[in-house]
């Protein structure tokens, strides 16, 4: 049994030798072949989940493949500072000690965050190592390291100077816990709420209009009531005034096409400071903008007696007051979509605030370059999603009300001058005042990670880390990056932003190829969640099975564009595969103590030539699939070669030609190189066992050359495929007459291609030994009184002269009778209209399928009986 505990030792040896670094494969590097892939930097607070495991596995397969194929490879690792998440973790720890961050002040709090990062952050890095991934660890970056801080400042200042970053009062998404959010940080969910119909009386009149709203707590901020200009019901009221309940403030009735006449009563309140659409209406009609609660969602002085209440708590009390005063006409159940903060699940509020924004015009160049095909998406349909999102792009809110993060490099002096600077200024550049302060907000985390594809290669770092973790030629060698692999769920959060931020600076898209994988779900296709109890923890899977088994399972399931349905059964299947190739090693070493490298021997055995031809087909298919990111097809090709071609038939056939074993072992060693990017540890172990070496004192398989395809004579494959077909067919025919493992005197083979028998005569020993026949004869006619098995290219006959058929016929008749009874029962059930009408659909379908299977079995037994009776 393979010892998975070797994985840690093997990994440590390879890392210490520097194999993962850019020049780790220097002995096999070829000129002008560079490959770069960026690790999506996981949060410093994170632990390895199954989505990470998939991303990192696929990235590492490509990294190892390219490294073995002679490329100079950079697999860039890193961690994201994760502004909100990290600040929340440290805040909670301090609160547990009875300390609020405000008591410490900004500088001391940030020191605490750095302390936490050094002590507890980055746990995920060790978990990545257990997965066996091979990034250039010496180049590990953190989105808050000094070099990347320099790059962020440079990017910000350049955009600021181009007026592509601006500050102003905007309607934004606001979380009362986490502050400003960009549009894609808001998750919309179905909500079972209420629609409140409130009476707004006309000024100096007993007439009233009924306004429908889902958010009565905001009505103190109403500055108009709105109807559709074509709604004849309300035409006479336009330009008149209504009186707000409770506050008794007069507001105007306006007409605007934004109103849906069919919604509620056709009359809606306009709250420009608390609704995205009303904000636009307010601008069009020059309305007042009145905010009725603060940044924490607490109602302010505009709300009279309700001041000091939290917005959602206030709703019930405001409605109760309106009801007591007779202003509520009715309340209806109402389903709608509500935005929630993607981090804390708090209801998000539209809120007017002075924030920093990146103008949407920044994306234009990247849109044009994608249209020209400079980046290719896998699967291709993601280009449609990318284009649709970019087409509807809005200005991106990049300021966050946090302390942990990249503080916005904008300064304000006492004379109200504003400027951006990459370095802390000494005086105001306009008035030379020394009395100035820096903007207190920090940048959205995605702003810094949006520079990742170029900042990790030294762009904007100034001299920090130069010649230690990056070099001057990195941008030339590795930009644009060769490939990005990540989940489709961050296409807009991260990928699109990297594309427009990098292109705006370097005028070149950051990636040649973009592979977006789907989600990892359970075997029933459900999302993994703690509540369902269906979460597969990769850390536990590695402990129970091994890193190799998890990696190969994920690769087998990674079909482009389809969700990955992972289960323990799939992991067990790959464990069986691992045992299969481990046992192949045992068989080989029973016959030989050591196997030469394939390049150092000449193949003489016909069997070895056949297995080598199958291996070359495998090489061709694996390379082609990896080059097109069809990971599942590449893994399946390897699975079939090792299991079917080598273990099932190569080893089996070698029992008839013992001299072939030495050559088969050399082929097996070469095939382990092909497997290594997928299963690096067991391939390493088996390779050294067959070479009679140890990794401690020998080079690793991971820096050997990846096998290249060499065309082979197809005739040897044709001959051996007929041999195998003959063996299988004879075994099948023997099983029909209960002679499964017994030796028989003679079998006859009738080939569809009569010419082939002359070529195959030399190989009869394989059939005689493995099919257990004393003799094989060729026939050109069907034999009477013989059991027959028909396959694609031949027919097998075994005469029945000396076979007692009575017991066999009785057994088959009994089987037939049993199947007929089961078939009759199912047929009766499916002919019953009541059963069809009342049974669950899936039960009906299962019974139909069972009936079809019974028919097939009955037909097969009938044919067998007919053959036996002549």
From Swiss-Prot:
The terms under GO molecular function for this entry are: aminoacyl-tRNA deacylase activity; ATP binding; valine-tRNA ligase activity
Annotated positions binding ATP: 530
Task: Name any GO cellular component annotation.
Answer: cytosol
UniProt keyword Protein biosynthesis, yes or no: yes
Has keyword Aminoacyl-tRNA synthetase? yes
> Which reaction(s) does the protein catalyse, per the Swiss-Prot or TrEMBL entry?
tRNA(Val) + L-valine + ATP = L-valyl-tRNA(Val) + AMP + diphosphate
Q: Please give the coiled-coil regions recorded for this protein.
A: 800-870
Q: Where is the motif 'KMSKS' region annotated in this sequence?
A: 527-531
EC category name: ligase
Q: Where are the transmembrane segments?
A: none
- List its EC numbers: 6.1.1.9
Task: Give the residue ranges of motif 'HIGH' region.
Answer: 42-52
What family does the Swiss-Prot or TrEMBL record give for this protein? Answer: Belongs to the class-I aminoacyl-tRNA synthetase family. ValS type 1 subfamily.
| Subunit-level organization | Monomer.
Q: What does this protein do?
A: Catalyzes the attachment of valine to tRNA(Val). As ValRS can inadvertently accommodate and process structurally similar amino acids such as threonine, to avoid such errors, it has a 'posttransfer' editing activity that hydrolyzes mischarged Thr-tRNA(Val) in a tRNA-dependent manner.
NCBIfam families reported for this sequence: PRK05729.1, valS
Per the record, what about its domains?
ValRS has two distinct active sites: one for aminoacylation and one for editing. The misactivated threonine is translocated from the active site to the editing site. The C-terminal coiled-coil domain is crucial for aminoacylation activity.
The name of this protein is: Valine--tRNA ligase
């Amino acid at each position: 049994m393979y010892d998975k505990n070797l994985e840690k030792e093997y990994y440590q040896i390879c890392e210490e030798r520097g194999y993962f670094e850019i020049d780790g494969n220097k002995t096999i590097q070829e000129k002008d072949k560079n490959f770069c892939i960026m690790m999506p930097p996981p949060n410093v607070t994170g632990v390895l989940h199954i989505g990470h495991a998939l991303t990192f596995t696929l990235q590492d397969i490509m990294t190892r493949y390219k490294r073995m194929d002679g490329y100079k490879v950079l697999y860039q690792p890193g961690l994201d500072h994760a502004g909100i998440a990290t600040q929340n973790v440290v805040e909670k720890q301090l609160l547990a000690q009875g300390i609020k961050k405000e008591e410490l002040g900004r500088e001391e709090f940030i020191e605490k965050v750095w302390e936490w990062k050094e002590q507890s952050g980055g746990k995920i890095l060790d978990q990545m190592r257990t997965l066996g991934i091979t990034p250039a660890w010496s180049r590990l970056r953190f989105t808050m390291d000094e070099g990347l801080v320099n790059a962020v400042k440079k990017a910000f200042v350049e955009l600021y100077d181009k007026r592509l970053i601006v500050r102003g009062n905007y309607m934004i998404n606001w979380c009362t816990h986490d502050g400003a959010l960009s549009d894609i940080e808001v998750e919309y969910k179905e909500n079972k709420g209420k629609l409140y119909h409130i009476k707004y009386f006309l000024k100096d009149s007993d007439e009233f209009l009924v306004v429908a709203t889902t958010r009565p707590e905001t009505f103190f901020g109403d500055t108009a009531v709105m109807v559709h200009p074509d709604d004849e019901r309300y035409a006479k009221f336009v330009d008149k005034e209504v009186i707000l309940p409770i506050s008794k403030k007069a507001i105007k009735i306006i007409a605007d096409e934004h109103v849906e006449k069919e919604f509620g009563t056709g009359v809606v309140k306009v709250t420009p400071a608390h609704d995205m659409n009303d904000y636009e209406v307010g601008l069009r009609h020059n309305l007042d903008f009145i905010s009725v609660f603060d940044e924490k969602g607490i109602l302010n002085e505009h709300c009279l007696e309700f001041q000091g209440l939290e917005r959602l708590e206030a709703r019930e009390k405001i409605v109760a007051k309106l009801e007591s005063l007779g202003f509520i006409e009715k309340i209806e159940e109402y389903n709608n979509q509500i935005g929630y903060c993607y981090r804390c699940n708090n209801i998000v509020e539209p809120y007017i605030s002075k924030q920093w924004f990146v103008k949407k015009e920044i994306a234009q160049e990247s849109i044009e370059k994608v249209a020209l095909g400079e980046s290719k998406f896998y699967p291709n349909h993601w280009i449609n999603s990318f284009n649709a999102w970019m087409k509807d792009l809005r200005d991106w809110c990049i300021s966050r009300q946090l302390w942990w993060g990249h503080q916005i490099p904008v300064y304000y002096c006492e004379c109200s001058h504003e400027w951006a600077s990459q370095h802390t200024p000494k005086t105001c550049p306009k008035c030379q005042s020394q009395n100035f302060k820096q903007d207190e907000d920090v940048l959205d985390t995605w702003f810094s990670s949006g520079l990742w594809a170029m900042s990790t290669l030294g762009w904007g770092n100034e001299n920090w880390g130069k010649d230690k973790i990056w070099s001057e030629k990195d941008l030339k060698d590795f930009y644009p990056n060769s490939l990005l692999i990540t989940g489709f769920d961050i296409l807009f959060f991260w990928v699109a932003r990297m594309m427009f931020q990098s292109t705006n600076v370097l005028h070149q898209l950051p990636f040649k190829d973009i592979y977006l994988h789907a989600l990892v779900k359970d075997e029933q296709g459900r999302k993994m969640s703690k509540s369902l109890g269906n979460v597969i923890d990769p850390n536990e899977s590695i402990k129970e099975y091994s890193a190799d088994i998890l990696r190969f399972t994920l690769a087998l399931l990674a079909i482009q564009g389809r969700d990955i349905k992972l289960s323990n059964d799939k992991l067990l299947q790959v464990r069986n595969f691992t045992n299969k190739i481990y046992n192949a090693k045992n068989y080989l070493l029973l016959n030989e103590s050591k196997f030469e490298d394939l390049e150092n021997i000449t193949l003489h055995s016909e069997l070895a030539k056949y297995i080598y031809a199958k291996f070359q087909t495998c090489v061709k298919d694996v390379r082609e699939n990896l080059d097109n990111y069809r990971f599942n097809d590449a893994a399946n090709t390897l699975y079939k070669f090792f299991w079917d071609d080598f273990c099932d038939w190569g080893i089996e056939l070698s029992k008839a030609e013992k001299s072939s074993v030495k050559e088969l072992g050399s082929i097996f060693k070469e095939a382990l190189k092909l497997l290594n990017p997928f299963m690096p540890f067991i391939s390493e172990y088996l390779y050294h066992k067959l070479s009679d070496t140890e990794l401690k004192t020998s080079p690793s398989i991971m820096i050997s050359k990846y096998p290249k395809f060499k065309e082979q004579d197809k005739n040897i494959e044709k001959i051996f495929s007929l041999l195998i077909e003959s063996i299988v067919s004879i075994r099948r025919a023997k099983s029909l007459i209960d002679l499964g493992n017994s030796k028989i005197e003679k079998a006859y083979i009738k080939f569809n291609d009569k010419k082939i028998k002359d070529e195959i005569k030399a190989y009869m020993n394989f059939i005689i030994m493995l099919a257990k026949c004393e003799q094989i004869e060729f026939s050109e006619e069907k034999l009477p009184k013989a059991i027959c098995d028909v396959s694609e290219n031949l027919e097998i006959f075994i005469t029945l002269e000396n076979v007692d058929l009575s017991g066999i016929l009785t057994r088959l008749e009994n089987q037939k009778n049993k199947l007929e009874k089961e078939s009759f029962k199912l047929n009766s059930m499916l002919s019953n209209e009541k059963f069809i009408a009342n049974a669950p659909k899936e039960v009906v379908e299962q019974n139909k399928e069972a009936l079809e299977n019974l028919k097939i079995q009955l037909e097969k037994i009938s044919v067998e009986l007919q053959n036996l009776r002549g």
